[in-house]
A protein has these predicted regions:
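Amphipathic, small/basic residue-rich leader segments at the start of a protein or domain
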Residues: 1-87, 104-115
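Short, solvent-exposed loop/turn elements at beta->coil junctions and helix N-caps
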Residues: 58, 125-129
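A short, Trp-centered hydrophobic/proline-enriched beta-strand micro-motif
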Residues: 117-125
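A structural signal for short hydrophobic beta-strand segments in well-ordered beta-sheet cores
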Residues: 139-141
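Conserved small/polar residues in nucleotide/adenosyl-binding loops
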Residues: 154-161
């Protein structure tokens, strides 16, 4: 490991302490203003060259070696807003798309995902499926009239509609 990661970690820590922590109460409100504030923090992280540090360089990330990134990410993990503000929230999804997606899906989603223009989401807990293996998922999606309808399986005993 190089010693450069310690400087990067210190810069990230300062960014979180000076830019994110003071704004957490406002960010937590989920208002249009707080979303705009988060967008400004994302841009500031890009300007400061501390955006998406663990992402490979060929997809627009910082290319930081994994073990060095672990120490930086420990600081990032202290604030749920820091993960988004610093572009680390999409690392696993970005690598998955980079490695396994068809060129069409990579071209459509990878760059916007790494740049923070779109956000990943993945749900995996289902009844009758005791597994962390996504190939075991039973939820389906059906395209109806140009709109995807997700057919969910609920774990709650309360009655509810099975489609969203």
């Amino acid at each position: 490991m190089s010693k450069d990661w310690t400087k990067i970690r210190a810069k990230v820590k300062d960014f979180i302490e000076n830019e994110i922590y003071p704004k957490e109460t406002e960010l937590a409100k989920g208002t249009p203003e707080s979303r705009e504030m988060l967008g400004s923090l994302m841009q500031l992280a890009k300007d400061e060259k501390i955006w998406a540090l663990g992402h490979p360089t060929d997809i627009g990330g910082g290319g930081m070696p994994f073990m060095e990134y672990v120490y930086v990410n420990e600081v990032i993990g202290r604030s749920s807003f820091a993960m988004v503000a610093l572009g680390t929230h999409s690392l696993q999804d970005s690598i998955m798309l980079r490695e396994f997606a068809s060129p069409h899906w990579r071209d459509q989603y990878l760059e916007p995902l790494v740049q923070g223009e779109i956000f990943p989401s993945f749900g995996m807990t289902e009844p009758e499926v005791a597994s962390s293996d996504p190939t075991q998922l039973q939820t389906t999606a059906i395209l109806e009239d140009g709109v995807w309808r997700i057919c969910l399986l609920y774990t709650s005993p309360s009655p509810r509609d099975t489609e969203v």
